[in-house]
Amino acid sequence: MTKQIKKQPLLSGLLILFLAAMIFANIGGNMYQSFMPLYIKDLGASIRQIGLFFTLAQIVPLFLQILGGWISDSLGRLRAIAIGSVFGVIGFIPMVIADRWEWLLVAVAIGSIARALVGPSFDAFIAEHSSEENRGKVFGISQAIFMIVSVVGPPLGGWMAGSYGFRLMLLVAGIFYFIAMVMRLGMAREAAKGGASAPQKLSIDSLKINLRTMFGMIASGGLVTWILLTDGLRDVSFQFSENLLPVYMQEIGGLSLQQIGWVTSVFGICMMLTTIPGGWLSDKVGERVGIAIGMIFMSCALLLFINIPRDIPWLYFIGWGLAGVGIGLLTPAYQSLISKAVPAHMRGTAFGLFSTSLGVISLPSPWLGAQLWDRVNPQFPFMLTAIVLLLSVIPIWIKFKLPATDRKENAPSKESAVVTTV
């Protein structure tokens, strides 16, 4: 039996099809995400209003992420993703026809339903289709394939926005997402026909049980507590500056829309090249090593960004490359660590709860970042983020250790190690 398990491919046919649908959906998403602050600015928003927009845009997801994870745990990953994809397509409509930046909040609210259902399901689905000893590696390979979207999406979006305007670019992005929706609906239908997953009844009692268990783990002061605290600190610092970076590159760096697309693509290439080594590193020496090194790389990238002279724009490529390496190293490690730290039947709820908790903590951060841009200087929000990332390495190195007992409790049985459909 052991030999048969070892012969199982790291990526099953279903997982490859799952990733293909994700690629189509997120090529559409990456075509506009890097340019969303600039689109808001194009519709008449000031720097402070851009910060306010991204603060308000976080409110709806706060109420949906936990519900999305719970629905994923109850109905199954593929069903939850299919339902979310329908809302994702609908969300593109107000985005394309908006004539004021305030209308984009409607698009973001509808899109939040899609992200709430798809986001927790993505990591949980991959975790369920991998054995524990190879989980970091599978997350790394999946992320490497998935990062095609960051290589293709931003340059395509930048070229279309610069040449034909934001609306046509968003329309094409919506077509990519529509193709993904059709694929996902087909996968969910086939899973239902084959009886691959038995959906549970959605009930308030089951939600209460899941939340009670998760809050107990958070309050215990163990690994889950420290993951939440350090990731919350990281998210707060990122929200200070993340949504202002495209504006910074355009106004301070002097980059065009096409150039912003290309430097963002370098981020995707470097992340794609490092996620597999990051997953391997996670499996071999532990998750905290990749997470700590990734934080250092991202901090260095931000410090480089704020010191780039306007007449040397090619340094932005190096900065985005460093950021891509950092994210590539820490992402599979984080995903692997969370999936091992919580019970298998609650992974969707766990990923949703983490997203919600982080959103609550970082809710005012985009608005505060915009205030710091205006009241101090444009570089200050990025410098603050870089300092926080460096300081977070200390608790990560000390506390991000999975106890041996947890590894045994979460280890899959020989039967569950064989790839199955959801």
Where are these regions (language model features)?
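C-terminal ends and interior cores of transmembrane alpha-helices
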Residues: 86-99, 297-310
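Residue-level signature of mid-helix packing/kink "hotspots" within the transmembrane helices
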Residues: 58-66, 150-151, 268-276, 362-363
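Helix-to-loop junctions at the C-terminal end of transmembrane segments
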Residues: 64-76, 161, 275-286, 373
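Cytoplasmic membrane-interface "Motif A"-like loop-to-helix N-cap segments
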Residues: 74-85, 284-295
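Juxtamembrane intracellular "pre-TM" segments in multi-pass secondary transporters
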Residues: 1-12, 190-226, 414-422
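Short amphipathic helix-loop junctions that connect adjacent transmembrane helices
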Residues: 35-48, 243-258
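C-terminal membrane-cytosol helix-exit motif in multi-pass small-molecule transporters
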Residues: 175-196, 392-400
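Cytoplasmic helix-loop-helix junction between adjacent transmembrane helices
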Residues: 108-146
